[in-house]
A protein has these predicted regions:
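Exposed, polar/acidic Ser/Thr-rich sequence context and nearby capping/turn residues
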Residues: 220-221, 294-338
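Short, surface-exposed linear segments at secondary-structure transitions and domain or protein termini
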Residues: 116-121, 254-257, 322-334
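Short, low-hydrophobicity acidic/polar segments
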Residues: 2-226, 306, 325-327
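Surface-exposed loop/edge segments in extracytoplasmic proteins
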Residues: 96-111, 240-245, 310-319
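Low-complexity, acidic Ser/Thr/Pro-rich "mucin-like" tracts of secreted and single-pass surface proteins
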Residues: 24-30, 39, 271, 275, ...
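Exposed aromatic-hydrophobic patches
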Residues: 7, 119-131, 269-272, 282-294, ...
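Short helix-loop boundary/capping segments
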Residues: 180-197, 201, 205-287, 296-298
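Solvent-exposed loop/turn and edge beta-strand elements of beta-rich ligand-binding domains
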Residues: 1-5, 85, 95-97, 232, ...
Length: 338
């Protein structure tokens, strides 16, 4: 690979979706554009004999909520101010059409950090230069560079085609990350310094690769006033998946999530003491689950215990969520009413 004298650097572009108004997942839009809730929007708990049954509504909002603090594990990234301190990049230089034989011959899984002097994102350790003898350069990036245990870039330096990344969701909720992926269009290398990004760097617009899951109380009947939530549990969730770092036709990312064995699934339990009050948020911030976007095929359940109910026994309130979709880059909030 014949390189020139223009160093490769990057610009992180604010491209994250901002949270929007909450919309019930089972809602329909009327001719006037307003949200219409279908009768099936709220799921009744599975205990058919419950005297005062609990109901569950699924609410989907655009984007993933951010928090104004330095970006580390468990932070949901909303803009560049929250961004991670480094990310990984692979760069493929090639001529003609992109094909599965193209390899990361320019950069392979290089750590990139912000230079405090130039305020630009530059590769750690050494400089890389734009090629002179190749027509195109294509970049693939992920953040953060330091992934949780069991997660890694699957593709090697000798593998051709679109790279894949394996992600394993940490068992500890506070260790979970807001995984970000950037897949910009190929850049014509000879035009870089003249037409594209002089003095700034190759722009990377990162997208949320996961789905945020939260819980809250929607409404409480007067006869249930004063009760408290003691535990919420999301059971038997897949925790290992492979992401192809290329956008699909709908602008999402392609995840392969095997059902697997108990080693690739987990149950997340929140032990709480929260009043059952209308509008009460149950989990948020670093208690937000960051899960794989997918349509739930298996028999997955949300379990709830209230005060006075034995935590050592089967959950009195259970909701099956098979068939629901966790959309990529969005927040799914499960709201309880009783």
């Amino acid at each position: 690979l014949l390189t020139g004298t223009d160093p490769v650097c990057f610009e992180v572009v604010d491209g994250w979706s901002k949270p929007a108004a909450a919309v019930p997942q089972a809602a329909a839009l009327g001719s006037d554009g307003r949200v219409r809730e279908r009768p099936s929007g709220a799921i009744r708990e599975e205990d058919a004999g419950a005297e005062r049954p609990m109901f569950l509504e699924t609410i989907v909002t655009d984007g993933i909520p951010g928090r104004p603090q330095a970006a580390t594990r468990s932070v949901q990234i909303e803009d560049e101010a929250d961004f991670y301190d480094s990310f990984g990049v692979s760069a493929y230089a090639y001529s003609g059409d992109w094909n599965e034989q193209c390899k990361p011959n320019l950069m392979y899984n290089v750590r990139v950090s912000r230079n405090a002097v130039s305020n630009r994102w530059v590769p750690d350790g050494r400089r890389y230069f734009w090629p002179k003898n190749k027509e195109w350069v294509r970049f693939f990036a992920y953040a953060p560079y330091s992934l949780p245990s069991g997660s890694r870039l699957l593709s090697t330096a000798n593998d051709g085609g679109i790279p894949k990344i394996r992600y394993r969701v940490p068992a500890n909720v506070t260790d979970q990350i807001d995984l970000l992926i950037a897949t910009p269009d190929a850049v014509r290398s000879e035009d870089y310094d003249v037409l594209v990004y002089p003095g700034k760097g190759m722009p990377l617009t990162f997208r949320h690769a996961l789905t945020a899951i939260q819980f809250r109380v929607k409404s409480v009947a007067e006869q249930n006033s004063g009760r408290r939530i003691r535990r919420v549990q999301l059971a038997d969730i897949p925790t290992t998946g492979d992401c192809t770092m290329q956008l699909d036709a709908e602008g999402g990312l392609i995840w392969e999530i095997p059902r697997g064995t108990s080693a690739t699934r987990n149950t997340y339990t929140f032990d709480l003491d929260i009043p059952l009050v209308s509008g009460q948020q149950i989990t948020e911030g670093d208690q937000t689950l960051m899960m794989f976007p997918h349509t739930i095929q298996a028999d997955l359940y949300i379990h709830v215990w209230l005060d006075g109910e034995n935590l050592d026994q089967t959950a009195p309130h259970s909701f099956g969520i098979q068939g629901q979709t966790w959309p990529i880059g969005k927040t799914v909030t499960y709201a309880f009413s009783m």
